[in-house]
Amino acid sequence: EDATDSAVKAVVITVPAYFGVEQKEATKKAAQLAGFTEVTLLEEPTAAAVYYGYKGDKNETVLVYDLGGGTFDIVAVDIDGFKYDCFAVEGDYQLGGKDWDTEMVKIIKEKLEEQDCDCCGLSPEDEAEVRRAAEDLKIKLTARESAQANLRLEVGKAKIEVTRQEFEDRTRPLLDKTIELTKKVAEDASAKGKTITKILLVGGSSYMPQVQQRLTEEFPNIEVPNPMDPNKAVSKGAA
């Protein structure tokens, strides 16, 4: 209301595709208690499909691959004009970009040990510095084959380099988990007579090149478009 300088009584809220009736009703009730009189719930994969251009003029079935910071889910969405049916859902709600960060932290500490830096007793401040560097390196490696980080630790300064290949090799088991769940949803869709045409990438962690590359390898007959601002795909689709 501060942004629009007017009262806001209608709201669109996105919810995970795995939400049941009770969870949806609880969400709607919470919005009503907050003062909203018109509450529309939109499943997140539907919002993502709308953002990718599915706005009433297409009839096909797509997969929405959503790899966020803390969770992963894969959903099959059947699109018939303005009708969106999320009919198959799988996910790992303990898996997300934070796990890739954790593996990068391990890589950094190994490289620090090679420089005779004892990582067993790092202070909380140094641990935070290592995690900051890990997140920064992960982002840099989306566009580069290698990246460097300068760390300012209590035990001294350090400079390390990590290659994309090194990072992808280390995190392959994490990506494998998402691929297995994606295969399961694709098989469920096929069993229902549906043909998957595209895999839409959602969630900031889907920026990592290994995601699109691996999906393209595993599903050669399905188009995997370049991610379109995956961090905001759901919110922009809802808007």
Give the location of each predicted region:
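Oxyanion-binding/catalytic loops of NTP- or PPi-dependent enzymes
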Residues: D2-A239
